[in-house]
Amino acid sequence: MTTPATVLQRVTVHTVTSKDTLEAHPVELPDYERGRFDDIAFMTAMNLCLMGNYAQTGHFGGPLAYTPYNVACHLAGPDLGGLRYDLRNPKFPYSDKFMLSGGHNIPTCYALWMILYEALRQQHVATGDDRFAVDPNVAILPIDALGFRRG
């Protein structure tokens, strides 16, 4: 169940001090569209499972565990601690750099990027608006998954 975006959540985060005692820190979570994040995370998880099953490879525990983090980093925006970047120009020198350690976890990135690039592609086709145009040599599209670890 997701929390409505209009509700400001209050949570308590506990940290362990150097004296092995717990300290409580009340934190207010800002409003954001959690339902949309959950939807994209679900689609990303399903996409990476489909890719892995098609390629007959791997174990999905790592990538599935990283999926919510990956989605939040890419979609939250800098005001909520996310990346400052433009998906249409991923090599822009002044955008934030994204590195996910653990090479086996990269499928979550591929799965998310496919969803985001496909959304841009479909929006460009539907509207003709060049703001949604992406160079197909830069984009990672679903058709690209056919060659992942296959063969």
Annotate each PLM feature.
Residues 64-151:
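Cofactor-binding active-site loop characterized by glycine-rich and histidine/acidic residues
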Residues 1-72:
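Conserved acidic/glycine
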